[in-house]
A protein has these predicted regions:
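C-terminal motif of bacterial Sec signal peptides marking the signal peptidase cleavage site
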Residues: 13-16
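Bacterial signal peptide processing site
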Residues: 18-20
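Residue signature of alpha-solenoid helical repeat architecture, marking inter-repeat boundaries
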Residues: 22-26, 65
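Helix-turn-helix repeat elements of alpha-solenoid scaffolds
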Residues: 41-53
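Structural register within alpha-helical repeat arrays
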Residues: 73-74
Length: 114
């Protein structure tokens, strides 16, 4: 009896060591965003836009949803690149997916109107 309980306990412990699938797929976001913030040139901006598009289009995490803030960051980047319609659409998607971001997004939109 004790031997059976011990074996079951070991199996449970080993089963808990398996890799968990991440909630979101980030691809190479950390490196690309670091490069963008460090250089802030045209090439790094284009890489950042491509990374955002990949995160949005190819989400493979367990939630199958775009991570919080990605639509907002992408929209703000598009607004800065004078792609206003696309940028505003991304900001609206952020609000639709994460309603608690509405106050922050409204501030961004007011700031961009000035």
């Amino acid at each position: 009896m004790k031997k059976t309980i011990f074996i079951i306990a070991i199996i449970v412990c080993l089963a808990s060591c398996t890799n968990q699938k991440p909630l979101y797929s980030w691809y190479n976001y950390n490196n690309v965003s670091y490069n963008y913030l460090k250089n802030a040139d045209e090439q790094s901006t284009q890489q950042m836009i491509e990374t955002y598009q990949k995160i949005i289009e190819k989400q493979k995490g367990t939630r199958q949803a775009v991570p919080p803030g990605i639509y907002a960051d992408y929209g703000f980047l598009l607004l800065q690149a004078n792609r206003e319609e696309e940028g505003k659409a991304m900001l609206m998607k952020e609000i639709a997916l994460y309603p608690e971001s509405k106050i922050f997004i409204d501030r961004i939109l007011k700031m961009m109107e000035k």
